[in-house]
Amino acid sequence: MAPRILKHFYMKDKYMFEAYKDNSELPQKVRIEASSKCQLDCVQCYMRLDPEGVEKGCGLGNLKFSDFKKFVDENNFESIEISNHGEIFLNPELEKIIKYAYEKGIELYAGNGVNLNYLPDKIAEALVKYKFGSMDVSIDGASQQT
């Protein structure tokens, strides 16, 4: 019985999405995660527990450009927050993501924070060139112990 119920909800949600996807009253902002990886091991961060055993600390993966492109092309958002728990600058396809959003007129921002421990020059240049919206910078601790 459970698979039938799940199929019902999937079909209902799919129909509702298709019926209203161009409706300007739907949310114009969304948060997706460019990377769930992080090079830090902050004591206060629950992501460091790594329940999946993928890597030490955070580390489930990066948003693929192809997935981002499909998401953007199938929806009508004005802005997208691309930060959540990982460090966005660890995504090797971030420059393409930033450029594509700019070309589509979508503002990107990182309101949930970045740590800036890794910021390649080409990404820093892309942030300026493609008018990245804003970002909050997170300080990982007051000392080595915290």
Locations of regions flagged by a protein language model:
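Conserved alpha-helical substructure of the radical SAM core
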Residues: A2-M135, Q145-T146
